[in-house]
Amino acid sequence: MESKFWEDVEVGEQLPVLEFPITVKTLILGVCGTRDLMPYHHDPEYSKSIGNRDMFVNTMFEQALFGRFVTDWCGPESDFRETGLQMLNQLCPGDIAKIEGTVTEKLEDGGEPRVKLQLTASNHIGVAATSTATIAVPSRSDGAVRPLTSIDRPKMDPHPEIPDFAKAWLGVESAKGAGGYPVSEVQVMYWCDMVEDMNPLYADTPYARESRHEGMIAPPMGLITWTMQRAGHTGVDAAAPDVNFPERAPWPPKEAQKEGGGFPMPPGMTDTIAQGSVQAYGVPVRPGDRVSSTNETLNCSPQKETKLGPGYFQTNLQTFYNQKDEIVGTNLFTLLRYGGSGGA
């Protein structure tokens, strides 16, 4: 796997197209690679029963596939600094995911050479997802990319007409909630298996040990995977996580929730659709790390009339920490909260 230098990248450059078949095995590997046991990603009957075309790959799979696509092009000497993702459609078994990308900008940020990319994933129906990526790239004049040792949490000015109920949410960061499992070499390998990612930094290789990271790291866009709960706790209904046998209680038995916390729901709203997210990456995650996260609401629009009825666009922040209390990444994402009668 060769690595690009910043000087050799051209704005407008097209990345080599990647075609990736989506099969039943792809979905199984997706469950293994992301630890996401939500039934619409592995149970076709259930997924169709709630109006989907079939079972479909999750957002973490899309992030992994875009990540593999970028590093296939730039090589392992570049580091991801930020990615964005917007899901537009679903990739299901039988589809061929076509991944395309373009260099949109070359810049220096704080003296660090960077490249910005615009990416798309499409199938026979149309565009399934779009993504952006900002990568730090080695330079012949400035040398190798330097791993980050810290990262700031993003800030946002609230909407000038933010509803009164949402003002009380601002500045309130939840307690930390830890993932169900520590990061492991095996889990990273499953992640690579699901999208056929050959990045040598994601394995205990001589290259990784001799690299700027001084050892194996985890794919940076796996932030949400590292905080997924135990498999026996994951489901549409957390109290009855197996949709095929609702009588089965969570296993191992769950104690009262003492840590973490979700995001508040605007009054009168009942449903949620993710609109998009932007992740930024800090201290690299490594096997053996125990990742936890906090939640905070940064913004909320006034009530809007949408295709789904009245709703609010709510911007939330997840901050991810390792066991040393270092920030390993942030996830800034917007949700459409809808389904109520309005008038709140």
Locate each region found by the language model.
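HotDog/MaoC-like acyl-thioester-processing domains
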Residues: M1-P16, L91-G177, I273-A344
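Hot-dog-fold acyl-thioester-processing enzymes
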Residues: M1-D79, R140-G276, G342-A344
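Mid-chain, well-packed structural core segment of small domains
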Residues: W73-G84, L88-P93
